[in-house]
């Protein structure tokens, strides 16, 4: 009998959602490949990135993925975007996926340009399509842990899977809106991190709110342009998984991508800023992936390209800004 939810990944976002499910009453078995972290969680019942949060007795921990997913009625992942493929490959060795699998990470794979749901399909095969789901939207982990109101989107290919995921995550303070556009939700969640780095740079250089508003608006336009090429629904990018997530990531002081931009503006290098943040900055890696995809499809994405060049071609920040400001203006929605 399937009795619990298996959770893969125990970073702050993974811990946040695993705690939400456990506090709702579901038994949750959470996995991490980090034995030191698992030992600390088991012994101290506190997460190092959220030390004030008491861990629910419904939440247990393991370094054995098989233990986490065996007899689970649902599996949720919260690893880094770069960790999705290794997780999928490990899953392939130990199970035939036949329960809802919820992706909560955000990113685009480098070199392949694949969204995270597409990686799962490539590794596990098309037979898992009915079981795949995706959760995205404006959801700062610490606010969710504090019980602050939050609205997100859950997407799935299969209506029954969508219903199961919706029911599992829904709470009065964690409102879940159903959606069938997995690719659109995944793309919005990935690209907004790149725009947030640009906003962090603008803030760090004291450009003001007018500049940030322009970056957010034109950034959304870039997201929609790429979404159109990838057969996503434009309304998805206008909703919680697109505009909503973009806004919170570009304006919240808790946003690590925004803070990463601040550090770049202070003169730190890519590696120095990354070390200072101390956690994965997904936008720094998505900038490369998104640039590769845009170049392949011959799509003009100047903000994304600018961040890519700053991070990977050592373009001077001021020169990059000058290039953006000197671009010819054209009709707004072209």
Curated annotation (Swiss-Prot):
Pfam families: NAD_Gly3P_dh_C, NAD_Gly3P_dh_N. Its main location: cytoplasm. Its EC number is 1.1.1.94. Sn-glycerol 3-phosphate binds at residues 106, 137, 139, 192, 245, 255-257. It is found in: Cytoplasm. Pathway: Membrane lipid metabolism; glycerophospholipid metabolism. It comes from the Bacteria. PROSITE patterns: NAD_G3PDH (PS00957). It catalyses: sn-glycerol 3-phosphate + NAD(+) = dihydroxyacetone phosphate + NADH + H(+); sn-glycerol 3-phosphate + NADP(+) = dihydroxyacetone phosphate + NADPH + H(+). One of its GO terms (biological process) is glycerophospholipid metabolic process. SUPFAM superfamilies: 6-phosphogluconate dehydrogenase C-terminal domain-like, NAD(P)-binding Rossmann-fold domains. Catalyzes the reduction of the glycolytic intermediate dihydroxyacetone phosphate (DHAP) to sn-glycerol 3-phosphate (G3P), the key precursor for phospholipid synthesis. NCBIfam families: PRK00094.1-2 (NF000940), PRK00094.1-4 (NF000942). Belongs to the NAD-dependent glycerol-3-phosphate dehydrogenase family. This is Glycerol-3-phosphate dehydrogenase [NAD(P)+].
